[in-house]
């Protein structure tokens, strides 16, 4: 069993060194950044080390956020052929060996897994060497890495109570952490030109991009009353930018936006997928949204996320199979043409927000460390 050394604790028994492992997409990474900020808030001299892969979004964003990053080999076991699985298995074993070296060098108080296959090597090494560890699970159905390792962690911090059965008495419902900037976004005064923020997560969404492109002819009479801010993902940025230009719309189109909270703050309406982190950010920001759940998410959990928002009268949902340019345009016109309805969605979204999730998770991390002393 790992025995905590005095130098991993702050003067008030706060965590001085922590590893945050995983990423791949913003949905995994951004909650981890929120937790890192909370650790720093409690201990201003705390050292945070992120561990991920070179292929994930963390390779670009973690250094931009001012944190150290170490990359390990790892690979997904889902959605790939047997040859790729064999290669990824070898990479993951190498990653576990590398993770053990990192643990020996950094000697953290705790290892926090944020999900994704990138978390697997570091969490596995923490389990094998007895370091305190916990996992964060954002979705109603856990990812493969969390399902495989969940029985050997100290705690599983959950967003959705329905996930409880996967982790038994290690499960604690904390909510999904949101970066601090989203919580301080003020209410918006709605007046033309209305800003519509469109994105499909950190990697974009082809069906949303297509529907927005096809919606433009149906929004032609609103051309002077709309401004689009559209995060397309890497593969469609030029195509979508050209569509706006050809239709004569004012649009800022990029593959990826840094400082995304600024786009939320300026938005009158959001069109997005319904990943757990996106939904948590929409709630925290208090913004009205049209949610288009990704239809191939495990056990259709994005539909469950969106439906919970609809049940709270906090968002509009359009099923991916029913998403057309004409329907999207009609929904945009309906909401932006009724400011009272827009403001009601915003109020209800903010009411549904859990704003202290990262505090609850760091409390769990401290509890995990204390259990190993």
Description of each model-found segment:
Residues 6, 11-16, 181-198, 205, ...:
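Nucleotide-sugar donor-binding and catalytic loop/hinge architecture
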Residues 18-23, 45-91, 96, 234-236, ...:
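Conserved nucleotide-sugar phosphate-binding/catalytic loop shared by glycosyltransferases and other
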Residues 98-111, 119-134, 147-151:
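Glycosyltransferases and closely related glycan-assembly transferases
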Residues 49, 57, 68, 127-187:
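Active-site-proximal region of nucleotide-activated glycan assembly enzymes
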